[in-house]
Regions:
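A charge-rich, low-complexity, intrinsically flexible signal that marks solvent-exposed coils, linkers
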Residues: 1-131
Length: 131
């Protein structure tokens, strides 16, 4: 199973965000958000797709190089790529679905590309599972 991590990044007390990083091959597909996925009262929310990050970020905590602040791990676990299968073709996809199995975030999450805001912005929401 691929791994994921949610890091909380801080530059100072007023400048912080969360990064959701999803393992795909030798890199982490990364989205920046104002709320972590486990805080469902903050969802849906707009997230920004960042460049891929190194796998080392799965374990990264503490100071970030080049004076970019510091980070702590908010959540981690494994996940399953539901759409697109295996995470292949994300660059062309308009929708991504993953099933997270972490310490805090559990369940299916959907990211839908926001056509009005440009290719880098997506809407993140938790999918309600039918019983």
């Amino acid at each position: 199973m691929p791994r994921y991590v949610v890091q909380q990044h801080f530059r100072d007390a007023e400048d912080w965000h969360f990064d959701l990083m999803l393992e795909r091959g030798e890199a982490l597909v990364t989205f920046s958000s104002g709320v972590p996925p486990d805080r469902t009262e903050g969802l849906p929310c707009l997230v920004r797709h960042l460049g891929d990050h190194r796998l080392a970020y799965l374990e990264q905590e503490g100071e970030i190089s080049r004076g970019r602040g510091w980070c702590r791990i908010h959540d981690r676990g494994t996940f399953e790529w539901l759409l697109p299968p295996g995470g292949e073709g994300i660059g062309q996809a308009d929708e991504i679905r993953v099933r997270l199995a972490g310490q805090a975030a559990r369940g299916t999450y959907r990211l839908v590309r926001e056509s009005k805001t440009g290719a880098d912005y997506w809407r993140l929401r938790k999918v309600t599972e039918k019983a």
